[in-house]
A protein has these predicted regions:
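Hydrophobic core segments of alpha-helical transmembrane domains
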Residues: 9-16, 41-55, 105-113, 150-168
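Membrane-embedded alpha-helical segments of small multi-pass membrane proteins
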Residues: 38, 48-52, 100, 111, ...
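Terminal transmembrane helical module of multi-pass membrane proteins
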Residues: 108-171
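Selected alpha-helical membrane-embedding segments in polytopic membrane proteins
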Residues: 1-84, 88
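Membrane-helix interface and helix-disruption motif detector
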Residues: 26-31, 89-97, 139-146
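Hydrophobic alpha-helical transmembrane segments and adjacent interfacial helices
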Residues: 13-19, 80-90, 110, 127-140
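Membrane-proximal helix-loop-helix units in multi-pass membrane proteins
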Residues: 64-121
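Structural signature of hydrophobic alpha-helical transmembrane segments
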Residues: 35-45, 88-103, 148-149
């Protein structure tokens, strides 16, 4: 799941940067907000569709459902709710969402890593905290690239370490 969302969100961040650069070059400043929101919404929709398909497949193959599985499902469901509420609050207050979104991602990722005692995931979660603070100092023009870098460090790198650890366990 970390790899799925890592790639989806990295793609969203990079495409958002490109969209904003193109709109800025055409001085279409009034379109930046709606296009940015639409870009993120499209990528999230695609991500949720892929996740739904992946989870259905995994649940069909699963023989045992543990309390740990239940805990992680609840943790990430609450995290998704926090993302939506945080985005709504940011839009209402007229501030950019990435610092808050990265903070929320850092919390859930760090807790996940601590719970399964997987150091790369803990480090990935902590990197989200650092990127969250850095996002408050970055020009809005580059915030999408910073967000993509945060996702690579927080989801993709730990996700590949986790995948490798799982494969070594199954050998």
């Amino acid at each position: 799941i970390f790899l799925l969302w890592g790639w989806i969100l990295t793609g969203a961040g990079i495409s958002n940067f490109i969209i904003l650069r193109v709109l800025r070059s055409k001085e279409a400043f009034d379109l930046m907000g709606p296009y940015s929101l639409g870009n993120w919404a499209l990528f999230l929709l695609v991500g949720f569709i892929f996740m739904f398909i992946l989870l259905r497949k995994l649940n069909r193959e699963r023989k045992v459902y543990s309390h740990l599985d239940s805990y992680f499902n609840k943790l990430w469901q609450v995290t998704v709710a926090a993302f939506f509420v945080g985005t709504f609050i940011c839009i209402r207050l007229g501030i950019i969402p990435p610092p808050i979104m990265l903070l929320i991602a850092g919390l859930a990722t760090t807790v996940s890593g601590l719970f399964i005692r997987f150091k790369p995931l803990v480090i990935g979660g902590i990197s989200f905290f650092l990127f969250s603070m850095a996002a408050t100092f970055i020009n809005n023009e580059y915030i999408a690239l910073l967000t993509s870098a945060a996702i690579v460090c927080g989801y993709l790198i730990p996700g590949y370490f986790l995948k490798s650890a799982k494969e070594q366990q199954n050998v």
